[in-house]
Amino acid sequence: MIAYLIGVDGGGTGTRVRIADRSGTLLAQGSAGPSALGQGVEAAWEHILSAIQAAFHSVGQSIPGWSECAMGAGLSGISNLPRRDRFLVMNPGFARIALESDAYTALLAAHGGRPGAMVASGTGSVGEVLYANGVRKQVGGWGFPVGDEGSGAWLGLRAMAHAQAALDGRAST
């Protein structure tokens, strides 16, 4: 029987989890290193499990058997089907797993599940929209260096290029 509902937000910088009981009452929160699938499926599982363990430990609770847990995860890189499949094959025993992109779960969180749009600019960048008719569209999110306009890496490269051009006298300061 599923006793715990675990929500995972997994990206290129870190992993955050929330654990609730079956009624949806928040019990604990935890965090760990990155769980973007592009940084390795094994590493993603390692950090997700570490964040879950940290959450349970933060409230003085022992870690239950994974078969008592259902996990819903918004993960960066989930659209890469071979990585997604490998992630699912490596399931350590969760009773259920639901996977979505971290962009879509961020959109759902930002708008309470209602139609809307959002742009995330952090380690990576992506835009996502959910229309009133249920259709969704993602823009960007292809990863560094070709599809990450607005990300930290993209902005940093542009800033360094401008600074060097300014030092050469080819750009204004």
Task: Map each language-model feature to its residues.
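Short glycine-aspartate micro-motif
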Residues: 5-9, 68-72, 116-120, 127
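Short glycine-rich anion-binding loops that position phosphate/pyrophosphate groups of nucleotides
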Residues: 13, 76-78, 123-126
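Residues on a specific face of well-ordered alpha-helices
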Residues: 46, 50, 105, 153-161
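Short glycine-rich, Thr/Ser-proximal phosphate-binding strand/loop in the N-terminal lobe
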Residues: 2-46, 50, 54, 136, ...
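Glycine-rich phosphate-binding loop plus the immediately following alpha-helix
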Residues: 135-173
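Conserved phosphate-binding catalytic cores of ATP/NTP-utilizing and phosphoryl-transfer enzymes
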Residues: 1, 95-119, 135
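Short beta-strand-loop/turn "lid" adjacent to the catalytic site in phosphate-handling enzymes
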Residues: 36, 56-99, 111
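Short beta-strand scaffold segments in enzyme catalytic cores
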Residues: 15-19, 108, 118, 125-130
